[in-house]
Structure formats: C-alpha cells, structure tokens
Amino acid sequence: MPFLTPDVYFSHITDIPGSFFEERGLKLIILDVDNTLTSHNNPTPFPGVQEWIDARKGERLTLAILSNNTPDRVRSFAEKVGLSFVANAAKPLTFGLSRACKKYGFSSKETCIIGDQLFTDILGGNLKPGVTSILVQPWEPEQHGFLRVKRTWEAPILRRYFAKINKHS
C-alpha cells in the first residue's frame, strides 16, 4: 500500500529539526491541526509546538495549516499560533493541498505535509506527486468513535511499515 506509506516518520512534530527541511529543499510545510499540533477542538497547542513553529518561521520556511475542519475552528487556532490556513480541505483529496501550493507559490517538490493520520494526511500527500509525506504519532488516544475505527484500520499498515523500517535500520 504505497499510497498509505509515509515518506518519513517522527514521533512528534517537535522532533523534526529545521535541518530536515533544508536538506531536502522543502520550503512549504503543510500542517494538520488535530492531534498533530493540538487536541481536538482545543485552541491551545501541545507543549513545544509554538516554539517549533516559531523556530521554523525564523528559518524562513513557510508554514500553513491544511484542515478538513471548518474555517471557524481552524481560524481560531491558526490565529493563536500565527499561521495562515486552508480549511475544508477534504483530505485525502488533493485539491486543498493544490490550493495551498498555489496560494503560497511553491511546487509540490518544495512541499511537505505533516499529520497523524494515514487515510487523510499521508494519503493526501502521496496522491500529489512530489509532496513529501511525514507521519507523526498522535499525541493523544482518539476520543471520537469514527477516528477510533480509523486507528484500528491503520494499525496493521503501521505494523508492516515499522517492521520494514526497523529491518533496514
């Protein structure tokens, strides 16, 4: 299932060093919100996230939020952390990601997407040729029914992915 396989994995977004982006020529960092930057419907970022965002902005990288949530939900969080956003993205469909690339003036090869879900963030990134997909571990267990179901669907895919990368490391 190559479309569900991330290009790279980190435990949390705060574990990704700025040098990672520079080494790969990545200039546009597209970020998921829920369970990547904050918990669901929470206006406060997880510990260390604001500092991570500020450090990447200081490195002259462009960061933006891409979310399937409504503009009202995304706007309140985006304003708090100082980022612009594209809402109603309909991930894994790629038109939201394409809109973000066009809005900020970067090619797919200069773009990465960071998120915690295989079936939205990673699949969406992998469906747009050239985009680097980065999976991060969710910060918290899912509380919502459908998201818990999706996590059970992700589990066997992630087991195979981690077995493969551990075999090669």
Model-flagged regions — what are they?
Residues M1-L31, T38, N42-P43, P47-I113, ...:
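Asp-based, Mg2+/Mn2+-dependent phosphohydrolase catalytic module
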